[in-house]
UniProtKB/Swiss-Prot annotation:
Binding site for L-aspartate: E171, R217, H448, R489
Coarse class of the protein's main subcellular location: cytoplasm
UniProt-annotated location(s): Cytoplasm
GO cellular component terms attached to this protein's record: cytoplasm
Name of the protein this chain belongs to: Aspartate--tRNA ligase
Gene expressing this chain: aspS
Biological role stated in the UniProt entry: Catalyzes the attachment of L-aspartate to tRNA(Asp) in a two-step reaction: L-aspartate is first activated by ATP to form Asp-AMP and then transferred to the acceptor end of tRNA(Asp).
Family: Belongs to the class-II aminoacyl-tRNA synthetase family. Type 1 subfamily.
Stored HAMAP family: Asp_tRNA_synth_type1 (MF_00044)
SUPFAM superfamilies, sorted: Class II aaRS and biotin synthetases (SSF55681), GAD domain-like (SSF55261), Nucleic acid-binding proteins (SSF50249)
InterPro entries, per database record: Aa-tRNA-synt_II, aa-tRNA-synth_II, aa-tRNA-synth_II/BPL/LPL, Asp-tRNA-ligase_1, Asp-tRNA-ligase_1_N, Asp/Asn-tRNA-synth_IIb, AspRS_core, GAD-like_sf
Pfam families, per database record: GAD (PF02938), tRNA-synt_2 (PF00152), tRNA_anti-codon (PF01336)
MF term (GO), any: nucleic acid binding
Length: 595
């Protein structure tokens, strides 16, 4: 039906007859001429109708926005004065000789000239996707997946599919369950990741595996989370952690070069402990130069228990955050930031405004100055490298609260005060995570997942001191987003059972939930390691949006609902009966007597 795409016509086509298919993006009737901007997935081209072609001209008078049409016409070069530098096709236009209205359109429920609510955009997603910026994001996504496949194929990786209907295993989030009609009372789980299957593939001898795969997690959503998401899943045998990181870093560097023409350079690395100490985050945004600076040793003896208490507590921390130019902040702005960090458990936000650095304590303004002497103030100013016009915020609490609160404040200040350099890319590797973390109930939980190997520990050493274990794990972070995470896996049955035991999984539960894995580990398992990238996050970064729903064709809301199809919905009672399922309403869901 077409010979060219609208957005691909240029001066080389001048004089040629073309057939185009697409939509009316805009129509202008000048009386003697009718102009339309015609749009398809590749872009927009100007088409004009002349009364000399009476049939086409008369039909063109009926055109309205979003009519689906086909035109036949001749490509002409525009006069110099009529060229449009804002359009990729602005040097040419089409003189239409034939017009077919394929389908008419009712007035759109979306306004192309204004910002529509996200609810309206998701309800009419098929119309929202007609917008060039949305179409371009999905085209970029397709380009990314094509690039990844070529790269992985060139590196000798095999694209192998793993099951969608599998067994529920504890991986940190709730599973989406699928009832079995054949096996009454039993359920499949949709995979949170292909983790165990890709490890089993290593045991099968497929030493380089990858897959671009859907994963499912029934968890509370955020701007960068969806209940179903896509991973670039990778696993290797007989490769060390540095070797895995080298290949995956090369993939990302070449991807950025291909899509953005940007050289990311070699990725720096830092340990989890360093990242938390300096940035209050295990995924630090290095575009922001501000850092947390420990000052507890300077404040142990002050008569201000808010400082001295945490400073003398082995689990406490007192840290300072210097804000360049922050002395210009008003009291209300500071109070707003204090309220902001309450979300992270902080109870207050002490500060020092540096008016004249050379004057020491005489050159500052601070509500806590009365608790500090000149020597302490000078040490704080020196350690934080404060200058005239700066502001220093303090966090004093448990180490976790200080890291969480000041880490979040650092990011917010970076955005609010334009301290974060939005024109650069800042990738890094974060290494050496703790293997376990406190679950809040006198137990431990795996920081990554229970199949991650510890660094340089025997099963007996791990069992005796699990809280000291460092995981052989690594995360790739770009501009404050964790875009990929991986680890060396456990390939020893005794070590795997030891980890399960530390996590409180009984031997009976181990057999019930992971018997197939424990059996497989008995048969010559190779050392293996891998990584998974969040494809949606990669596309989000590469297309310059901060909302993951912008890079998924048909996403869910933050309530995990599809406004377009109205999923989820109630199941047919007959289907539930066939599955042996009865829906039991909770008391709060039942209608009251007054309803």
């Amino acid at each position: 039906m077409r010979t060219e795409y609208c957005g691909q016509i240029n001066l080389s086509h001048v004089g040629q007859q073309v057939t185009l298919c697409g939509w009316v993006n805009r129509r202008r009737d000048l009386g003697s001429l009718i102009f339309i901007d015609m749009r398809d997935r590749e872009g927009i081209v100007q088409v004009f109708f002349d009364p000399d072609r009476q049939e086409a001209f008369t039909l063109a008078s009926e055109l309205r926005n979003e009519f689906c049409i086909q035109i036949v016409g001749t490509v002409r070069a525009r006069d110099e004065k009529n060229k449009n530098g804002d359009m990729a096709t602005g040097e040419i236009e089409i003189f239409a000789t034939e017009l077919t209205i394929i389908n008419r359109s009712e007035p759109l429920p979306l306004d192309s000239n204004h910002i529509n609510s996200e609810e309206a955009r998701l309800k009419y997603r098929y119309l929202d996707l007609r917008r060039p910026d949305m179409a371009n994001r999905l085209k970029t996504r397709a380009k990314i997946t094509s690039f990844v496949r070529r790269f992985m194929d060139d590196q000798g990786f095999l694209d192998i599919e793993t099951p969608m209907l599998t067994k529920a295993t504890p991986e940190g989030a709730r599973d989406y369950l699928v009832p079995s009609r054949v096996h009454k009372g039993k359920f499949y789980a949709l995979p949170q990741s292909p983790q165990l299957f890709k490890q089993l593939l290593m045991m099968s001898g497929f030493d380089r595996y990858y897959q671009i795969v859907k994963c499912f997690r029934d968890e509370d959503l955020r701007a960068d989370r969806q209940p179903e998401f896509t991973q670039i899943d990778v696993e290797t045998s007989f490769m060390t952690a540095p070797q895995v990181r080298e290949v995956m870093e090369r993939l990302v560097r070449e991807l950025w070069q291909d899509v953005k023409s940007v050289d990311l350079g070699a990725f720096p690395s830092m340990t989890f402990a360093e990242a938390m100490r300096r940035y209050g985050s295990d995924k630090p945004d290095l575009r922001n130069p501000m850092e947390l600076v420990d000052v507890a040793d300077l404040l142990k003896n002050v008569e201000f228990k808010v400082f001295s208490g945490p400073a003398n507590d082995v689990k406490g921390r007192v840290a300072a955050l210097r804000v360049p130019g922050g002395a210009a902040l008003s009291r209300k702005q500071i109070d707003d930031y204090a309220k902001f960090i309450e979300t992270y458990g902080a109870k207050g936000l002490a500060y020092i405004k540096v008016n004249e650095r050379a004057k020491g304590i005489e050159g500052i303004t601070s509500p806590v100055a009365k608790f500090l002497n000149a020597e302490i103030v000078e040490s704080i100013l020196q350690r934080t490298a404060a200058a005239d016009g700066d502001l220093i915020f303090f966090g004093a609490d448990s180490a976790k609260v200080v890291a969480d609160a000041l880490g979040a404040l650092r990011l917010k200040l970076g955005r609010d005060l334009n301290i974060t350099n939005g024109s650069v890319w800042a990738p890094l590797w974060v290494l050496d995570f703790p293997m376990f973390e406190d679950d809040g109930e006198d137990g431990l939980t795996a920081m990554h997942h229970p199949f991650t190997a510890p660094k340089e520990m025997s099963p007996e050493q791990l069992k005796n001191a699990p809280e000291t274990a460092i995981a052989n794990a690594y995360d790739m972070v770009i501009n404050g987003y964790e875009v990929g995470g991986g680890s060396v896996r456990i390939h020893n049955g005794q070590m795997q059972q030891t980890v399960f035991g530390i996590l409180g999984i009984t031997e009976q539960e181990q057999r019930e939930k992971f018997g197939f894995l424990l059996d497989a580990l008995k048969f010559g398992t190779p050392p293996h390691a891998g990584l998974a990238f969040g494809l949606d996050r990669l596309v989000m970064l590469l297309t310059g949006t901060d909302n993951i729903r912008d890079v998924i064709a048909f996403p869910k809301t933050t309530a995990a609902a599809c406004l377009m199809t109205e999923a989820p919905n109630f199941a047919n009672p007959a289907s539930l009966t066939e599955l042996g399922i009865e829906v039991v309403k909770k008391a709060k869901d039942r209608p009251s007597e007054n309803d």
